Amino acid sequence: MENVPGSFGTSASFALRFGQTIFSAASLIFMCFDYDFYDFTTFCYLATVMAIVTPWSILLALTDTYSVLVKLLPQELRVLSIVFAGDFVLSFLSLGGACAVASATELLASADGKICDGNLCIQYQVSAALAFLCWFLLLASALFNFWSLPSLYY
């Protein structure tokens, strides 16, 4: 297997997974600071996606840690395909959630502050920004794994 930096089982992959875990957990925490986020579907969607991304990233970060410490890269096509598919799907789900929350927050903020007071809108905007950062790292992980996928065929 070709050792692509950032592919599954490397230290660069661990760094990407650690960033995903931090950003997704922080986005979820900022979203859940207010109990009124259940009133809007887009906010619930982002909270659900980040609640899925966080354990996914933690599990793969632990797997990367084990692979780095044992110095054994996972060489099964099926495992790398599942990791690639999960990263790819979750990256676009988090992009959709981040875009939806960013646009809904902008819409609520432009309503003369009647619906979304100052700190509440800032919390939602920070949550959307953290979700965008998580999306970027998820997409990078998916692309690195996609890049190393053909080397398992021969």
UniProtKB/Swiss-Prot annotation:
Q: Does the keyword Iron-sulfur apply?
A: no
The subcellular localization recorded is: Cell membrane
Major place of localization? membrane
Keywords for this entry? Cell membrane, Membrane, Transmembrane, Transmembrane helix
Q: Where is the signal peptide?
A: none
How does the record say this protein sits in the membrane? Answer: Multi-pass membrane protein
Q: Which residues lie on this side of the membrane: Extracellular?
A: 34-41, 103-128
* Transmembrane parts of this sequence: 13-33, 42-62, 82-102, 129-149
Output the Gene Ontology cellular-component terms. Answer: plasma membrane
Q: Which residues lie on this side of the membrane: Cytoplasmic?
A: 1-12, 63-81, 150-154
Q: Which domain of life is it from?
A: Eukaryota
Query: What family does the database annotate?
Result: Belongs to the Casparian strip membrane proteins (CASP) family.
| Assembly with partners or alone | Homodimer and heterodimers.
Name this protein carries in UniProt: CASP-like protein ARALYDRAFT_485429
- Taxonomic lineage of the native organism: Eukaryota, Viridiplantae, Streptophyta, Embryophyta, Tracheophyta
